[in-house]
Amino acid sequence: MSSPRDFRAEPVNDYEGNDSEAEDLNFRETLPSSSQENTPRSKVFENKVNSEKVKLSLRNFPHNDYEDVFEEPSESGSDPSMWTARGPFRRDRWSSEDEEAAGPSQALSPLLSDTRKIVSEGELDQLAQIRPLIFNFHEQTAIKDCLKILEEKTAAYDIMQEFMALELKNLPGEFNSGNQPSNREKNRYRDILPYDSTRVPLGKSKDYINASYIRIVNCGEEYFYIATQGPLLSTIDDFWQMVLENNSNVIAMITREIEGGIIKCYHYWPISLKKPLELKHFRVFLENYQILQYFIIRMFQVVEKSTGTSHSVKQLQFTKWPDHGTPASADSFIKYIRYARKSHLTGPMVVHCSAGIGRTGVFLCVDVVFCAIVKNCSFNIMDIVAQMREQRSGMVQTKEQYHFCYDIVLEVLRKLLTLD
């Protein structure tokens, strides 16, 4: 098993929690930009269903059918044990919702009954025990060699040099679709846009959504994803259309709705087992859910109103990524990624954080590496990130996130060598 290539370290704030309040929400200039590291590939398939503007009707939910609580302990300054939300949803805005102050950093979790356990902690522990299909003396030696190379890279700050090389790499690409006046308000950040060559088209008219097809080739196998921003209130309908058109059965959400008092992603799913989320073309039912210590599982049935066709979708929301930086422990994220991989059955896995490049890039990179380890394949973290950046600008957004990719792989390899 061979390894990756170079990098450098110092905490850098990324999109997941650093925006200031906009003063004038009537101008495009109020949309936040990255002020950070930014950056086509295979031909992507086309889909059906025309994209039309759809209306959200969450306001039809009577309050006596549900109660929203924040079950997740805060990882930022304020730490209320529970926050009950009873007010109406705030209207959409011209600029990114990330500009809105919105209270403490919490994951919105419905207080529901009559649910069934979906997975046990024991099963998740088993999934975290990543083991190659072949684990003989030769393979153990290869793993030891790989571990030694990665540890030397970390000690010598080669990882930071790798990241710098990725930042300096010129990746010419066009963002014409995302920059069209009619599409600008669909972007959470004005400089985080999909390449025209890899953007996900909606419907026969190939309408716009801020999402990119990502195809990563490693050891002769292709891994297929959709990397996208967290939905805005105005793009929730488009988001579900994308999920259905691509026949995706897993959504990996790596953000809380609110972090550091800032809205990072709008609540795009139903909040009650009793009432579906009514959209113009789709009806989304919450059928089951499970709140774990570090992520939430939600099971949806999404019905296309015009045909009655129903589509099962599992959403996995990781809730332990801190407002700034990376998780203190890799163990919970390892379990999360492995469970997402086990759950994936159809279509590209849809992965999003807030901007759809930072934490999303970490997820994709580490998922590919874990699959490589299981299949006794070599991997190269720098090459994986380079492939992603050719298809969506700025994937794995910060030096800290890039280093975390190495840290989590090192932890898995070290545990692997302790197995009998």
UniProtKB/Swiss-Prot annotation:
One Gene Ontology MF term: phosphoprotein phosphatase activity
Tyrosine-protein phosphatase domain span: 159-412
Primary location: nucleus
Q: What is its EC number?
A: 3.1.3.48
Where is there biased composition of kind Basic and acidic residues?
Answer: 1-11
Q: In which tissues is it expressed?
A: Present in many cell lines (at protein level). Widely expressed.
Keywords associated with the record: Cytoplasm, Cytoskeleton, Hydrolase, Microtubule, Nucleus, Phosphoprotein, Protein phosphatase
* Any one Gene Ontology cellular component term annotated for this protein: centriolar satellite
Q: What reactions does this protein catalyze? A: O-phospho-L-tyrosyl-[protein] + H2O = L-tyrosyl-[protein] + phosphate
What subcellular compartments does it reside in? Nucleus; Cytoplasm; Cytoplasm, Cytoskeleton, Microtubule organizing center, Centrosome
SUPFAM superfamilies annotated for this entry? (Phosphotyrosine protein) phosphatases II
- Please list the disulfide bridges: none
Look up and give the organism this protein is from: Homo sapiens (Human)
Q: What is this protein called?
A: Tyrosine-protein phosphatase non-receptor type 20
Q: What broad taxonomic lineage does this protein's source fall under?
A: Eukaryota, Metazoa, Chordata, Craniata, Vertebrata
Q: What class of enzyme is it?
A: hydrolase
Q: Where is the active site?
A: C353
- Annotated spans, Disordered: 1-47, 68-108
The superkingdom listed in its UniProt entry is Eukaryota
Family listed? Belongs to the protein-tyrosine phosphatase family. Non-receptor class subfamily.
Q: Name one GO biological process term.
A: lymphangiogenesis
Feature: compositional bias, Polar residues = 31-41
Provide the positions where the record notes the PTM Phosphoserine.
S76, S120
| Function statement | Tyrosine-protein phosphatase targeted to sites of actin polymerization in response of varied extracellular stimuli. Has tyrosine phosphatase activity towards various tyrosyl phosphorylated substrates.
Residues that hold substrate according to the record: D323, C353, S354, A355, G356, I357, G358, R359, Q397
